[in-house]
Amino acid sequence: MSLPRRAAHAAIRAYQLTLSGLVGRQCRHWPSCSAYADEAIQRHGLWAGGWMGLARICRCGPFGTHGIDLVCEALPEGAAWHRPWAYGRWRGVNAPAPLGE
């Protein structure tokens, strides 16, 4: 794991162990936004994963999305370093298909 990924993981983990308890564990998604951002950074790197985490945090609000939202396995098509907003999913969730389908 690269140094930037380790630093991001340490910062997220510090937030989870300190401020998250003070703010309250009231995330509208599963996994929580901090766990989602940590997984996205570990899976896709600091640049792409950081943008994915930011998009998730922006969706987590009273009028945003809720429920199961997993980190995608592959980066979205059309995402590139010079178009960082394309890494994030700004609407909707990435949930598994219902069991009957």
Curated annotation (Swiss-Prot):
SMART domains: Haemolytic
Cellular localisation: Cell inner membrane
Functional summary from the UniProt entry: Could be involved in insertion of integral membrane proteins into the membrane.
Pfam families according to UniProt: YidD
Similarity section: Belongs to the UPF0161 family.
Origin: domain of life: Bacteria
NCBIfam families: membrane protein insertion efficiency factor YidD
Endpoints of the signal sequence: none
Keywords: Cell inner membrane, Cell membrane, Membrane
InterPro entries: Membr_insert_effic_factor_YidD (IPR002696)
GO annotation, cellular component aspect: plasma membrane
The protein, known as: Putative membrane protein insertion efficiency factor
Disulfide bonds: none
Keyword Lyase: no
Keyword Membrane: yes
Topology term for the membrane: Peripheral membrane protein
